[in-house]
Regions:
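Structured catalytic-domain cores with a bias toward divalent-metal coordination
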Residues: 1-393
């Protein structure tokens, strides 16, 4: 099995329900994918049982399905959400404080950053909703110092299913597959209404409700990070560091933050005994069309994981292409050439990656808040120094 000390146990609670208690299946269980309504039902049960969790409606899809955002932090931080949001709004637009660095330092010292995680924008990449349910439970109930520090220094915000229309279609298709073992079944033609993989190329056009809902949430909360979860290559690729060409409107401070977070992720997960974790790769950092780039274009930090997945909850023997387990300077601990891979393995990697990222972020929260302010200030100054900033037609 592929596991880590962060996911090889589940903290007990007499009052707060686990996903298994509400849905009848542990996170990452074989042969089970929850519909959107079940995912949301779990998060609302979690919020009803814990003062450290709040659920917010953030809009609806083209077909009328609800999208949610779930905030998790210490009870005192959740009680002060509005005041914290007002402080972050001033850091997000330094004109409101006359570009005063001393005032910004005061706001940084008083504020708590927001780390926004999104899952299941690509409907055939099925693991993130269950991983995020269990992650939320851990963050809400675990008394371990590692988790308590995250909970007291970061507001974790989660949208467990971004493409809600496509998720339900995918679950229906997967359930047909379970009811007809051994029979071929087609991939989804469309996920949303009417869009498939390119729902993650909409951050410029903003033509989809899911894009507008996530953008409104990120900007409305004045979050510092937007971390989008995907599935493809083995075993976890933090593509945040990326490769050239770099978009000229990306602040060099952000490039440094990508490096900080990405390489720390690789180091920490390698120390925890998880092979196949790497960054850099060949993902370019040019196009602002990806959902995560809503953060990069609003002075935050865009992040994305690609975790190994099976396009469903089947447990499958996977033989890797030699290129996938080649040892390189950026992949010194490559994945195994052949594995029996389950959705639980996928969930262990996603949760471990997110927890190590949240841990690093919580330990450097003041730094990232100050960077958030500086990037915002520099974005105001850049048109005067480097222009043009826009074209009017």
């Amino acid at each position: 099995s592929f596991n880590s000390p962060l996911t090889d146990y589940l903290p007990a609670s007499a009052s707060v329900p686990t996903p298994d208690k509400v849905l009848g299946h542990i996170a990452g269980a074989p042969d089970y994918l929850p519909h959107v309504a079940d995912v949301h039902r779990y998060f609302r049960a979690l919020a009803a049982a814990s003062p450290r969790v709040k659920v917010f409606t953030i809009g609806k899809s083209e077909e009328g399905r609800e999208m949610i955002a779930v905030a998790i932090a210490d009870e005192s931080l959740l009680a002060g959400l509005d005041a914290n949001r007002a402080r972050l709004a001033q850091l997000a637009d330094p004109r409101t404080i006359a570009m005063d660095d001393a005032k910004a330092d005061q706001l940084v010292a008083q504020s708590t950053p927001v780390y926004y995680i999104t899952g299941a924008i690509h409907s055939t990449e099925t693991g993130s909703p269950t991983a995020l349910m269990e992650l939320a439970y851990r963050l809400a109930v675990d008394a371990a110092p590692y988790i308590k520090h995250i909970r007291s220094h970061v507001i974790t915000l989660i949208t467990p299913v971004v493409e809600v229309d496509g998720r339900d279609r995918m679950v229906d298709l997967y359930n047909w597959h379970l009811a007809h073992p051994g029979q071929n079944y087609p991939r989804l033609m469309y996920w949303g209404h009417y869009v498939a993989h390119d729902n993650n190329r909409d951050a410029m056009g903003m033509s989809l409700a899911l894009t507008r809902n996530v953008a409104d949430t990120f900007v409305g909360w004045h979050a510092q990070v937007l971390h989008d979860l995907h599935e493809s290559v083995p075993f976890l690729y933090d593509n945040t560091v990326g490769d050239g060409p770099y978009n000229a409107w990306i602040d060099p401070i952000l490039t440094g933050e990508w490096q900080q977070l990405g390489w720390d992720n690789v180091q920490q997960m390698t120390r925890l005994g998880m092979p196949g974790v790497f960054t850099h790769g060949d993902f370019d950092t040019w196009s602002p069309g990806y959902l995560m780039f809503i953060a990069a274009m609003h002075n935050g930090i865009s992040r994305l994981y690609e975790t190994f997945g099976n396009d469903g909850a089947d447990t499958v023997k996977r033989t890797l292409d030699p290129a996938d387990y080649q040892r390189t300077w950026y992949r010194p601990n490559p994945p195994l050439p052949e594995v029996v891979w389950s959705q639980r393995d996928n969930n262990n990697y996603e949760q471990t990656g997110l927890l190590t990222a949240l841990n690093y972020f919580s330990g450097n929260s003041q730094l990232f808040l100050k960077n958030f302010y500086l990037k915002s200030k520099r974005s105001i100054e850049k048109p005067l120094q480097a222009g043009p900033a826009a074209y009017v037609f």
